């Protein structure tokens, strides 16, 4: 007999209803719950899947390289990066009529093409690529890497090549290898690439496979390195008049600390970035030799966690907090590890979003406004999903893996002991922020509507302005720290040697970049609106995780798992209190918050780019300003993307804008209905199907049953999220591209 899906659960495979399919999809990645799963097998499966993941990433980047080389205009773009629009790939669409073909034949192409808003052209250009041949070579190299990764994944599932459980739990060795090997050596390799290939290319000297062994990256060679005279590598940097990609105004330095931006490209100095990666490499290679393995030297993480002595002083543990039992808890719980990793990666991803625009690393990318907007929004949304995932797996850890006896008296136990204080503090912060921020916005909205805008309550963000002034911004006249040339911040070593300060001060006081933008009352308000969103999302997630094992209402919650809908009518009031429900609610708040973040960023930057900062400053202090002067005003291009007079190259975004709204609205159908609705709907559909000629020739074996409450919410949440992001992506790209190309 053919085995039914899913193979991993005999119990589910024998379910006679359509629940079999739904539950199987829900449990497919929950390896722990699969039939016959052992702890060792679990680790091996996850380990092998990492190679598949890497293969997908390599294939994806390879595809980008290949399509740009084949159908893009990289070589033309390199000749004039500021005025040429980069092409992502060609469009072949049999539905295009003449109007559409004409509209999408753009950027100097002879056939319909898509414009690239990912920044890959700027990245490849900055790192030294100049020809389509370079791109093809990269694509083929990554294809080979992808095949190797797939082979490695397959190999590590073969009995002889499956690592043992003890290998996976050897935390010290893994840390050493990841710190020194993964971070350290790869940073060193990147510094090497920048010094040997990218910096010479930026100075008009081509380095390829034919001459890289004979071309010295620095005229002094390695002599200064071996004699300790390292300062030689910083002498004679590129001048302010350097034309990127040519020898005009170029220097010879390879490792510098100039600060600020290259005047022509408006991006960080390549020599500063090479220096940065070299420094990171040194730090991480040292860090990768800190932990004790078979040589018996270095730190034991377990001993550090359990230590109660700090250089002879009695302490409770690391940071004077009790950590006994944490090593075992962390090392034996994949959910605990995943929670930490997602949280760290989420923070890093959000930092990438902030730094991509304020300190742009790629040549000329700051002048491609649509790309900057797309990259900021992309990274902030990803950060949001990662952060919510961190708390979800934290909650699963507490339900499945947390051992109260093993953690008695340590920091985890302490957090659970005083969870009421944590939750109530987050609650009052959220309430305070919500009422006060909304109160100010509503007050301002009303007085503007009544024609007395002078009655608005406008608060200058003086503390934030002080922080900007401390970093060197002169505009506010605070005359403090780096904005005062006589202060200790400006005169202390090494600044008095004019190492990085002049470049930094030029950059922070320039009106043409996004470094420390000038802020006022509108920024003050939206900052607090975002703070409200962040604190409320955190409140929901923290409560969901800390109450995942049990709460006053339902002390035995842990016995019901992560995603129970309710515990029956016998204990009324136990609906909507599982950790899954907290995750579900937090997703909406997360999306809401990132909406505010991206609205703010985009509107503020539209003003900076257009040279009209007054519109944001005047309209952002009341609600109608946001609705009318940001959303409505900037969606006009989308609403007009195609009309009775034909089409333009924004029509695809206009269509996506409509379609995104449709997907988003579909979400509500699943969110605002409970199980009985679905059961009746399905029985009605089945009844109609069985009485419809021809249709009733098609039968199925599974008895149709309704979506559970949790399943319907998942479908609703998926539609809501996808529609929400799709709608804003279309709005963001079209409104920016309509203004700046």
UniProtKB/Swiss-Prot annotation:
Family matches, as Pfam families: PsaA_PsaB
A single cellular component GO annotation: plasma membrane-derived thylakoid membrane
Residue intervals on the Lumenal, thylakoid side: 71-131, 196-269, 359-368, 450-520, 611-650, 738-741
Enzyme class, UniProt record, top EC level: oxidoreductase
Regions that span the bilayer: 39-70, 132-156, 173-195, 270-287, 335-358, 369-400, 420-449, 521-545, 579-610, 651-672, 709-737
EC id: 1.97.1.12
Chain positions recorded as chlorophyll a B1 binding sites: 661
GO BP term, example: photosynthesis
GO MF annotation: an example: electron transfer activity
Positions that bind phylloquinone: 678
Cofactor binding: number and manner: PSI electron transfer chain: 5 chlorophyll a, 1 chlorophyll a', 2 phylloquinones and 3 4Fe-4S clusters. PSI core antenna: 90 chlorophyll a, 22 carotenoids, 3 phospholipids and 1 galactolipid. P700 is a chlorophyll a/chlorophyll a' dimer, A0 is one or more chlorophyll a, A1 is one or both phylloquinones and FX is a shared 4Fe-4S iron-sulfur center.
UniProt topology in membrane: Multi-pass membrane protein
Keyword terms: 4Fe-4S, Chlorophyll, Chromophore, Electron transport, Iron, Iron-sulfur, Magnesium, Membrane, Metal-binding, Oxidoreductase, Photosynthesis, Photosystem I, Thylakoid, Transmembrane, Transmembrane helix, Transport
Binding positions (chlorophyll a B3): 669, 677
Annotated localization: Cellular thylakoid membrane
Catalytic activity field: reduced [plastocyanin] + hnu + oxidized [2Fe-2S]-[ferredoxin] = oxidized [plastocyanin] + reduced [2Fe-2S]-[ferredoxin]
Subunit organization: The PsaA/B heterodimer binds the P700 chlorophyll special pair and subsequent electron acceptors. PSI consists of a core antenna complex that captures photons, and an electron transfer chain that converts photonic excitation into a charge separation. The cyanobacterial PSI reaction center is composed of one copy each of PsaA,B,C,D,E,F,I,J,K,L,M and X, and forms trimeric complexes.
Family, as annotated: Belongs to the PsaA/PsaB family.
Protein's UniProt name: Photosystem I P700 chlorophyll a apoprotein A2
């Amino acid at each position: 007999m053919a085995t039914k899906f899913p193979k991993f659960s005999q119990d589910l495979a024998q379910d006679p209803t359509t629940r079999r399919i739904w539950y199987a999809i829900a449990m497919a990645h929950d390896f722990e719950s699969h039939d016959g799963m052992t702890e060792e097998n679990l680790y091996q499966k996850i380990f092998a899947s990492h190679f598949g993941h890497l293969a997908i990433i390599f294939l994806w980047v390879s595809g980008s390289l290949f399509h740009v080389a084949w159908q893009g205009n990289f070589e033309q773009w390199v000749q004039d990066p500021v005025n040429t629009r980069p092409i992502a790939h060609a469009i072949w669409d049999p539905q295009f009529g003449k109007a559409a073909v004409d509209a999408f034949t753009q950027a100097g192409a002879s056939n319909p093409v898509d414009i690239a808003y990912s920044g890959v052209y700027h990245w490849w250009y900055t790192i030294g690529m100049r020809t389509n041949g370079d791109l093809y070579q990269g694509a083929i190299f990554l294809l080979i890497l992808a095949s190797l990764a797939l082979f490695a994944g397959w190999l590590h599932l073969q009995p002889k090549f499956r690592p043992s459980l003890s290998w996976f739990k050897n935390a010290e060795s893994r840390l050493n290898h990841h710190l020194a090997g993964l971070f350290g050596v790869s940073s060193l390799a990147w510094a090497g690439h920048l010094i040997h290939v990218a910096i010479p290319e930026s100075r008009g000297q081509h380095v390829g496979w034919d001459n890289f062994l004979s071309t010295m990256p620095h005229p002094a060679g390695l002599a200064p390195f071996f004699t300790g005279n390292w300062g030689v590598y910083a002498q004679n940097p590129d001048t302010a008049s350097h034309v990127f990609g040519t020898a005009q105004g170029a220097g010879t330095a390879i490792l510098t600390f100039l600060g600020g931006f290259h005047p022509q490209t408006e991006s960080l100095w390549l020599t500063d970035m090479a220096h940065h990666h070299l420094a990171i490499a040194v730090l991480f290679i040292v860090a990768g030799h800190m932990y004790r393995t078979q040589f018996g030297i270095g730190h034991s993480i377990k001993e550090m966690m359990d230590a109660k002595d700090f250089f002879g002083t009695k302490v409770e543990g690391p940071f004077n907090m009790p950590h006994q039992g944490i090593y075992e808890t962390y090392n034996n719980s994949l959910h605990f590890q995943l929670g930490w990793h997602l949280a760290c990666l989420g923070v890093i991803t959000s930092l990438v979003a902030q730094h991509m625009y304020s300190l742009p690393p790629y040549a000329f990318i700051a002048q491609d406004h649509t790309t900057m907007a797309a990259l900021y929004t992309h990274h902030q949304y990803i950060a949001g999903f990662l952060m919510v995932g961190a708390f979800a797996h934290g909650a699963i850890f507490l339900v499945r893996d947390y051992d109260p006896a093993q953690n008695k008296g340590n920091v985890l136990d302490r957090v659970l002991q005083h969870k009421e204080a944590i939750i109530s503090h987050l609650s009052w912060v959220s309430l305070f922020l919500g009422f006060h921020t909304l109160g100010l916005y509503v007050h301002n909205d009303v007085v503007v509507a009544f024609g007395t805008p002078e009655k608005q309550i406008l608060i200058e963000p003086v503390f934030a302005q002080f922080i900007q002034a401390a970093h060197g911004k002169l505009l506010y006249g605070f005359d403090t720290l780096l904005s005062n040339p006589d202060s200790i911040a400006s005169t202390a070593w090494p600044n008095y040697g004019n190492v990085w300060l002049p470049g930094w001060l030029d950059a922070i006081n320039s009106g043409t970049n996004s470094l420390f933008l000038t802020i006022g009352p509108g920024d003050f308000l939206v900052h607090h609106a975002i703070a409200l969103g962040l604190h409320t999302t955190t409140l929901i997630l923290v409560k969901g995780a800390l109450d995942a094992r049990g709460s006053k209402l339902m002390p035995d919650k842990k016995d019901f798992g992560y995603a129970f809908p309710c515990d029956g009518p016998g204990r009324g009031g136990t609906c909507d209190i599982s950790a899954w429900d907290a995750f579900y609610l937090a997703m909406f708040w997360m999306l809401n918050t990132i909406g505010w973040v991206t609205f703010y960023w985009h509107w503020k930057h539209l003003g900076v780019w257009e040279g009209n900062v007054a519109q944001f400053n005047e309209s952002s202090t009341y609600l109608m300003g946001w609705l009318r002067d940001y959303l409505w005003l900037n969606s006009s291009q989308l609403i007009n993307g195609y009309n009775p007079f034909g089409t333009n190259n924004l029509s695809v975004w206009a269509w996506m804008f409509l379609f995104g709204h449709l997907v988003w609205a579909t979400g509500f159908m699943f969110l605002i209905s409970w199980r009985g609705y679905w059961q009746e709907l399905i029985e009605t559909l089945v009844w109609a199907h069985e009485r419809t000629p021809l249709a009733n020739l098609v039968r199925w074996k599974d008895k149709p049953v309704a979506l559970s409450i949790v399943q319907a919410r998942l479908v609703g949440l998926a539609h809501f999220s996808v529609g929400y992001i799709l709608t804003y992506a279309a709005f963001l790209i079209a409104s920016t591209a309509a203004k700046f190309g």
